[in-house]
Structures are given as C-alpha cells and as structure tokens.
C-alpha cells in the first residue's frame, strides 16, 4: 500500500502537464474514476471471494491493474499538450 500512496502526488500533477487548458476536467475525471473504483472494489472482492473461496485472487487482480497502469504511464507524454 505504501507504493500505491507514493503515486498519488505525481499522478495528480500529470493533468497539469498534459492538459493545462483542461486541468480541472482531467482532474475531475481522475477523481470520479477513483471514487467509482472505491465503491465497486469491495463488492467485487466479496463476490470473487464468495465464488472462489480464494482470498489471494482479488489481490492478484489488483496487482494486474497496477501493472497495467504502470505500463500505460510510459506512453504519457507531458512534453506534448493535448
């Protein structure tokens, strides 16, 4: 969880670099996506654990999403505005 928290500050700065004209909209979309994930993830975790009985499986999914996010971050180009 510490590594996840280390991304919060830098990822909030990304919209300012990529979309300076629409930084409010981009930040709002990021915040909305985070809120939706915060609502859905406990429900999804519960369903997965109930169906499989495996407590590790939901965490593997979380790690997979984090790795996908890391991979996609390499394609962000702050030197090119949208």
Curated annotation (Swiss-Prot):
Recorded name of the encoding gene: yjhE
Membrane-related topology note: Multi-pass membrane protein
Principal location class: membrane
Keywords of the record: Cell membrane, Membrane, Transmembrane, Transmembrane helix
Compartment annotation: Cell membrane
NAD keyword on record: no
Name this polypeptide is given: Putative uncharacterized protein YjhE
Organism this protein belongs to: Escherichia coli (strain K12)
Key word Transmembrane present: yes
Pfam families associated with the record: MFS_1
GO CC terms of this entry: plasma membrane
Listed InterPro entries: MFS, MFS_dom, MFS_trans_sf
Annotated TM spans: 29-49, 55-75
Superkingdom, natural source: Bacteria
A GO MF label: transmembrane transporter activity
């Amino acid at each position: 969880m510490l590594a996840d928290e280390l991304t919060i500050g830098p990822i909030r700065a990304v919209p300012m670099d990529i979309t300076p004209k629409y930084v409010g909209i981009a930040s709002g979309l990021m915040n909305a996506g985070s809120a939706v994930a915060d609502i859905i993830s406990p429900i999804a975790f519960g369903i997965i654990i109930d169906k499989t009985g495996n407590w590790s499986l939901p965490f593997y999914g979380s790690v997979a999403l984090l790795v996908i996010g890391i991979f996609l971050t390499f394609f962000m180009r702050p030197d090119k505005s949208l």
